[in-house]
Each structure stands twice: as structure tokens, then as C-alpha cells.
Amino acid sequence: MEPPSRHAGTDIIIEDARWRASVPGTERAIRRALVAVARQGGPDFTQSPAPSILLATDRIVKRLNARFRDKNKPTNVLTFEPLSPMHGGDIVLGYETVRREAAAARRSLRAHLSHLVVHGALHLAGYDHHHPGEAREMEGIETRTLRSLGFGDPWRQGNWQQAGSVRI
């Protein structure tokens, strides 16, 4: 495991070196996504505690998913609510699943990572996608945020499936 990297108040822990090898400037991409989502109406982590980000393997995500959701399989992103007012929560991403989804959707790994960081940050801020109105609002913020970062609309490109993302 590499030491945490601090950007904009966010602890970024890269458990799997393939993240850095596949997404040059990984930490900067994450920081940019968090700043961009605030500009589009999402959570502003300069005003509240920022989340910790763990870039992990599917094996780690599978273990967490089994322990906290009783689902013995990996997923793309898990979010964990803050345990105290001084903590911003946690966003955990599984490398193999995220890479596979990006390839299937014909998107860069950087674009998909940015999308899932934004998605996780919105979950931590209380947004959800279980009802059509909530989903439209959340997807709208995600789309505006990703466009501001120079990426296309994640809901119109490729085969993106939100079903794998979960909030705990």
C-alpha cells in the first residue's frame, strides 16, 4: 500500500498501483472531480469534511460488499457514511470492475474514475437514485460536472450501469 496523498482535504489511499499506472495524475483527477462537483451544485468539501478515497482491488471491494451489504461480489464503488461530524465518509473503488466498465462503455479510465468519484461524493451528500426524480437530479449534476471536466455525458455514452454503485 502506498502512503495517503492529501489533496483539497481528501485522503487518497492507492491500495493497487495499477490505478496510478492506468490513470496518470490519479490524485489530481480525483481532486478535480471533487472541486468540479461543488461548482455544479454538489457537496463543497471546502466547507465540510472531505471524504477519504480508497482505490482498491475488486478483492477488497468484494470483502467490504459482503461484510456491509451481504453481497459476496465486487462492485464499482461503495460509499460509507461519515462516522462523525469531523469525517467526510469514505468512497471505495474496485480497479478491475471500474476498468472493465470503462472498456465496455468505450470510455477512458480517467473519465469513469472521475464519474464514480462524483457519484460517490453525491451519495455522501445525501443524493440517491432509487426514485426517478432523485435519479434525474443526481444524473444532472453528474452530467454537468463531467462536461465541465471535458468528458461526455456518462448517461448517453456506452453501457454505463448505475446498479453496481451503492451507498452504505
UniProtKB/Swiss-Prot annotation:
The keyword Oxidoreductase does not apply. Belongs to the endoribonuclease YbeY family. GO terms for molecular function: metalloendopeptidase activity; RNA endonuclease activity; zinc ion binding. One of its GO terms (biological process) is rRNA processing. This is Endoribonuclease YbeY. It is found in: Cytoplasm. Single strand-specific metallo-endoribonuclease involved in late-stage 70S ribosome quality control and in maturation of the 3' terminus of the 16S rRNA.
